């Protein structure tokens, strides 16, 4: 009769690995989601993962000991309809359902529309969504917007009065999309209570990205979770 010999060290190692994986998986990630993309801009060629609306406006910089993707100036880009000017999209990747986590810092002056944007469902430069995180909410700021072959239109069911970007402060930001339910949720620092809630099913998949309507800022520590990602060449914008 064959005996199964167990080794406490093997069990301990397996248990430690399981704990490590659990610790590395943020709270709130749905079952069945895996890590589809991760970027901290430590790779010299990290910028090659993106397409941008103006290559001269974006660069990888080192700030306070960490690398980040920086929007350093207003893009020389004229959208066909009223929508953000400064856009950096993850190239050749199409996402449906997802949870996007990242760190954002706003480096511009303080005013009501001081913003950073998260882009999603981006199918063409005139067909996409974006979440606009701004200091003060109004019909054109701090909302979830759709660009559907006409100037952007807000459609969030719930928003806060705005966010406090502060000066030289990094913020944890999360964007969630459930295409079956049509739900869109945006979180800012507190990843348990959304600052924006919206519903729409117009664009069920598309590119993800970062930017600003007309300000400057940086993004780092990008992690995207989801059930799947489609590889498809992005046919628009510039490759740095």
Language-model features: where?
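Secretory/extracellular carbohydrate-interaction modules
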Residues: 78-148
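Beta-strand-rich interaction surfaces with strong enrichment in secreted/lumenal proteins
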Residues: 26, 86-93, 158-165, 208-209
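Short, aromatic/His-centered strand-loop micro-motif at the edge of beta-sheets
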Residues: 150-172
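Flexible glycan-contacting loops in extracellular carbohydrate-active proteins
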Residues: 195-223
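Extracellular carbohydrate-recognition regions
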Residues: 24-55, 231-240
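Extracellular glycan-recognition surfaces and repeat-rich motifs
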Residues: 45-75
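Carbohydrate-binding surfaces in secreted/extracellular proteins
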Residues: 41, 166-197
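Extracellular beta-strand elements of beta-rich domains used
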Residues: 41, 102, 222-224
């Amino acid at each position: 009769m064959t005996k199964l010999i167990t080794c406490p060290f093997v069990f301990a190692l397996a248990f430690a690995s399981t704990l490590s994986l659990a610790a590395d998986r943020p709270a709130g990630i749905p079952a069945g989601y895996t890590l589809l993309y991760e970027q901290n801009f430590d790779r010299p060629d990290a910028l090659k993962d993106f397409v941008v609306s103006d290559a001269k406006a974006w660069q990888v910089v080192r700030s306070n000991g960490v690398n980040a993707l920086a929007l350093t100036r207003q893009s020389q880009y004229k959208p066909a309809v009223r929508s953000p000017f400064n856009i950096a999209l993850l190239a050749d990747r199409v996402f449906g359902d997802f949870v996007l986590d990242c760190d954002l810092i706003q480096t511009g002056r303080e005013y009501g529309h001081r913003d950073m944007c998260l882009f999603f469902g981006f199918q063409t430069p005139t067909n996409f969504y974006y979440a606009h995180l701004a200091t003060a909410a109004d019909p054109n700021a701090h909302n979830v917007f759709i660009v559907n072959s006409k100037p952007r239109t807000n459609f969030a069911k719930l928003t806060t009065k705005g966010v406090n970007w502060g000066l030289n402060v990094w913020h944890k930001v999360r964007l969630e999309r459930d295409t079956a339910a049509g739900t869109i949720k945006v979180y800012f620092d507190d990843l348990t209570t959304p600052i924006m809630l919206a519903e729409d099913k117009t664009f069920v998949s598309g590119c993800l990205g970062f930017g600003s309507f007309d300000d400057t800022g940086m993004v780092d520590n990008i992690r995207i979770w989801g059930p799947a990602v489609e590889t498809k060449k992005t046919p628009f914008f510039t490759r740095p």
